[in-house]
Amino acid sequence: MEKWWFNSMLFNRKLEYRCELSKSMDSLGPIENTSLREDPKILTDIEKKIHRDLDYLEMEGFFSSDLNTVSKNDDDHYMYETQFSFNNNITSFIDSCIESFNLGDIDKYNDIYFYSYIFLKGRNCSESDNSSTSIITSTNDTNDSDSTIGESSNNLDESQKYKHLWLECENCYGLNYKKFFKSKMNICEYCGYHLKMGSSDRIELLIDSGTWNPMDEDMVSLDPIEFHSEEEPYKDRIDSYQRKTGLTEAVQTGTGQLNGIPVAIGIMDFQFMGGSMGSAVGEKITRLVEYATNQLLPLILVCASGGARMQEGSLSLIQMAKISSALYDYQKNKKLFYVSILTSPTTGGVTASFGMLGDIIIAEPNAYIAFAGKRVIEQTLNKAVPEGSQAAEYLFHKGLFDSIVPRNLLKGVLSELFQFHNFFSLTKNDKA
């Protein structure tokens, strides 16, 4: 009689617990990550698996209690210990089940699969370790450090594996697919930030197809002062950048047509030694200005530079005066039209010379424009530079240049400027 009463009570308690567990499982979705509700099939599979194992555990616990009742029915704490053990088994099973369906992995089946998987997981691996809703790590404390290190290493490997497919935005850290990035003019598709653009890409952006004629392509820098460096000789560094970029120097100069209008254009490339201005760069720009003067062409100079090239000493500094002198003859004596375009970054000797001498000065959005960089100013004056004080938008409101023009509108704006200054298209159908 006592055995029947005990088993009946135990069965009722377990049945009651089963009902409560089922109710809690029904509300698991909204309590945890809401992304689970996006795939009801996954949730249904989880519930089926849990209920199947619950049935097995209940039967096993029920029969084991029958076998042990004779020896333990006098123990007042037996019912409590049995249910406590049963609770532990259920809790452990639920934990392992949730771990197998990593909530961070479920989010990867969104439209931006690679964005969440490759970038967010790789870049924010330290943050995801602290987020229980993103990744549920092992409950075994002794293995926490090892699992974290292993996960971080795997995330880094994944980021490197797909690095050639994506370009990270400097502003919002969004990932832009490289295959389509060029067609978007190197503008972030998430926040509209203008990322750095190579000189060859800018030529394609501004100059009509098939009209580009480069000048002084064979002009290269030597080592005029035999600059000594413990890390890498100056000549070797030049050779390295030439192989890396496919350019001979940090500027490309030439002539072409912009919506049918003949122009002389020079475009600096920050990828080549930070766009630094050495003797070869200064000579190429000076020759371009002189050619535009003789041919009566409108002139465009696109600036992207860290300033004078220190490896050439005073020879790099004299380029500032040489280019400015050629521009004086072009603007003052010939009354021709020069447009300066400031991109990010434009600093140092370029800002102090031809960068600010344009008849019209245009800046790209968010461009970093300064004479001395933020770090140099803070180290020299021991004062903090206000945030954004060297950004194009702030400087525009202070009157430093004429307009901020987005990259996708730049060609049309230049075309209208040239037409306004009596430079007209050679073709019959002018492109808008």
UniProtKB/Swiss-Prot annotation:
Acetyl-CoA carboxylase is a heterohexamer composed of biotin carboxyl carrier protein, biotin carboxylase and 2 subunits each of ACCase subunit alpha and ACCase plastid-coded subunit beta (accD). Its main location: plastid. InterPro entries: AcCoA_carboxyl_beta (IPR034733), Acetyl_CoA_COase_Trfase_b_su (IPR000438), ClpP/crotonase-like_dom_sf (IPR029045), COA_CT_N (IPR011762). Binds 1 zinc ion per subunit. Its EC number is 2.1.3.15. This is Acetyl-coenzyme A carboxylase carboxyl transferase subunit beta, chloroplastic. Pfam families: Carboxyl_trans. The keyword Zinc applies. GO terms for biological process: fatty acid biosynthetic process; malonyl-CoA biosynthetic process. A zinc finger (C4-type) spans 169-191. Residues 127-154 are annotated as: Disordered. Keywords: ATP-binding, Chloroplast, Fatty acid biosynthesis, Fatty acid metabolism, Lipid biosynthesis, Lipid metabolism, Metal-binding, Nucleotide-binding, Plastid, Transferase, Zinc, Zinc-finger. One of its GO terms (cellular component) is acetyl-CoA carboxylase complex. Residues 128-149 have a biased composition (Low complexity). Its cofactor is Zn(2+). Component of the acetyl coenzyme A carboxylase (ACC) complex. Biotin carboxylase (BC) catalyzes the carboxylation of biotin on its carrier protein (BCCP) and then the CO(2) group is transferred by the transcarboxylase to acetyl-CoA to form malonyl-CoA. It catalyses: N(6)-carboxybiotinyl-L-lysyl-[protein] + acetyl-CoA = N(6)-biotinyl-L-lysyl-[protein] + malonyl-CoA. Pathway: Lipid metabolism; malonyl-CoA biosynthesis; malonyl-CoA from acetyl-CoA: step 1/1. GO terms for molecular function: acetyl-CoA carboxylase activity; ATP binding; carboxyl- or carbamoyltransferase activity; zinc ion binding. Residues 165-432 form the CoA carboxyltransferase N-terminal domain. Zn(2+) binds at C169, C172, C188, C191.
